[in-house]
A protein has these predicted regions:
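Catalytic nucleophile loop
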Residues: 84-108
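Flexible gly/pro-rich beta->alpha loop and the following alpha-helix that scaffold active-site loops
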Residues: 27-92
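Accessory recognition modules or surfaces
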Residues: 3-9, 16-21, 47-55
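N-terminal beta1-alpha1 ligand-phosphate binding loop
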Residues: 11-29, 42
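Short glycine-/acidic-enriched loop or helix-start segments at secondary-structure transitions
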Residues: 22-24, 67-69, 102-104, 153, ...
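Amide-donor transfer/coupling interface in amidating biosynthetic enzymes
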Residues: 4-13, 110, 125-240
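Short Pro/Gly-enriched coil loops immediately N-terminal to beta-strands
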Residues: 114-118
Length: 240
């Protein structure tokens, strides 16, 4: 996949929650001439999303990768993901998607010592400069998770936060896992606050403060996310 014409021009996105979509990344893909096809985990057959040769993006959601008894579809999703990763096909995981990648690669995924919800900066490794360098200069990303993961074997750590060390990793050039969110938009954020109201209340997290942070940091993150996804596309073989 070394030329623009050879790289598949459909992005396959797997959702686990309706309002957690590709967000600002979807606009980037459309600007670059890609099509986007969504699949709903637990509803749709995910086989096409995992078997194709282009980029698959696994999005976030409130369930844990270990909750397979309550959500049996996770077993099939993980099995398909293992096959995809073994074939080294381009894959990006965000939040739950990153946890699924870690689990599929044999790492432990488990409930963390505290929830990390809100906007904050990252500490990036030197290796992160290849793809995540747009997140330097105090760009704040959106953290929204309670689970965490150990670093998979042969994975390279790319980013950490004050609360959790393992915030992003890569395996080779084609597999990228982000525990944090880069896709959220200023306009869509209210849906997150409504959809996650029980979680926010139970964690005693200030919704007005989250709104304030969104207004302060979201636009800069959108610009950085545009550059991050372009760098990742270039690395996995898209040269447009």
């Amino acid at each position: 996949m070394s030329t623009t014409n050879a790289f598949p021009k459909t992005i396959y996105a797997i959702q686990h929650l309706a309002f957690e979509d590709l967000g600002s990344l979807e606009d980037v893909f459309y600007q670059l001439g890609f099509r986007v096809r969504y699949f709903e985990a637990g509803v749709d057959d995910l086989t096409p999303a995992f078997s194709h040769d282009g980029l698959t993006i696994i999005l976030g959601g409130p369930i844990g990768v270990y909750e397979t008894e309550d959500y049996p579809f996770l077993k099939d999703e993980i099995a398909l993901l293992k096959q995809r990763l073994a074939a080294d096909k381009p894959t990006l995981g965000i939040c739950l998607g990153a946890q699924l990648i870690a689990h599929a690669l044999g790492a432990k995924v488990y409930a963390g010592h505290q929830k990390e919800i809100g906007w904050g900066p990252l500490s990036l490794s030197l290796r992160a400069n290849q793809v995540l360098s747009p997140l330097l200069n105090n760009v704040h990303v959106l953290h929204w998770h309670g689970d965490t993961f150990d670093l998979p074997e042969n994975a390279v750590l790319l980013a950490s936060s004050e609360i959790y060390t393992n915030q992003a990793f890569e395996v080779g050039n084609n597999i990228l896992a982000l525990q944090f969110h880069i896709e959220t938009t200023e306009e869509n954020f209210e849906k997150w606050l409504i959809g996650h109201t029980c979680e926010l209340r139970n964690a005693n997290i200030s919704i007005p403060k989250l709104r304030e942070q969104n207004l302060q940091y979201a636009q800069a993150l959108e610009h950085a996310a545009f550059e991050v996804i372009q760098k990742f596309l270039k690395r996995i073989g898209y040269s447009g």
